[in-house]
């Protein structure tokens, strides 16, 4: 048996399971390890990595793109209705993401930051950019405050793990870009007023 020198984290609902693996082992072996070492009991789980469903059970983990410290999403398959035949079709990752509470929670975190920026920081930002104070000390204080609050939101976004999801990565990137533009505009305004 090969030495298991790498670790992957399985995200299953709101639970996290670190699993020791050898990246040369097959997906089938990983699933067997999951059943042995975790509370996951369903043999027919669906695994997703980087937004793609892992289906080829004979492929090695490294061939599937997994690395040390990779995060894998594990979901239960929906129970089949009576009389329907189980089909081995590729399920698009976005649908799986929309149904998974982990992805919903992460999307909610991103949206909460966006709402905070819109409701709390945008009025301060607009006031500073459109009506900067004539008092240099007050203007500098406003700039430092709005810059600090915007940077805090960037740090929060940086801490949001999108689990390899392209959709969530895009949402986070859009919000980072929006906040960065606001910061750039604050800096530009302070330079124009100082000139």
Curated annotation (Swiss-Prot):
SMART domains: BAG. The gene is bag101. Binds to the ATPase domain of HSP70/HSC chaperones. Gene3D superfamilies: BAG domain (1.20.58.120), Phosphatidylinositol 3-kinase Catalytic Subunit, Chain A, domain 1 (3.10.20.90). GO terms for cellular component: cytoplasm; cytosol; membrane; nucleolus; nucleus. Residues 83-98 have a biased composition (Basic and acidic residues). Residues 109-190 form the BAG domain. One of its GO terms (molecular function) is adenyl-nucleotide exchange factor activity. Residues 6-72 form the Ubiquitin-like domain. This is BAG family molecular chaperone regulator 1A. PROSITE patterns: BAG, UBIQUITIN_2. The keyword Chaperone applies. GO terms for biological process: protein folding; protein stabilization. It comes from Schizosaccharomyces pombe (strain 972 / ATCC 24843) (Fission yeast). Inhibits the chaperone activity of HSP70/HSC70 by promoting substrate release. Residues 78-98 are annotated as: Disordered. Keywords: Chaperone.
């Amino acid at each position: 048996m090969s030495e298991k020198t790498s670790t992957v984290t399985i995200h299953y609902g709101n639970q996290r399971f670190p699993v020791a693996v050898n990246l040369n082992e097959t997906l089938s072996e990983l699933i067997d390890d999951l059943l042995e070492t975790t509370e996951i009991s369903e043999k027919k789980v669906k695994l997703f990595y980087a937004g793609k469903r892992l289906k080829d059970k004979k492929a090695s983990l490294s061939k599937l793109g997994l690395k040390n410290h990779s995060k894998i999403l594990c979901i239960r398959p929906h129970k089949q209705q009576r009389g329907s035949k189980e089909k081995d079709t590729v399920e698009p990752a976005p649908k799986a993401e929309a149904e998974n509470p982990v992805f919903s929670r992460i999307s909610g975190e991103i949206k909460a930051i966006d709402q905070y920026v819109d409701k709390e920081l945008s009025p301060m930002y607009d006031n500073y950019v459109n009506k900067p104070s004539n008092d240099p000390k007050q203007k500098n204080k406003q700039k430092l405050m709005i810059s600090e609050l915007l940077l805090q939101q960037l740090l929060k976004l940086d801490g949001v793990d999108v689990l390899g999801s392209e959709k969530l990565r895009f949402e986070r990137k859009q919000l980072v870009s929006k906040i960065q533009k606001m910061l750039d505009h604050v800096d530009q305004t302070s330079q124009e007023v100082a000139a």
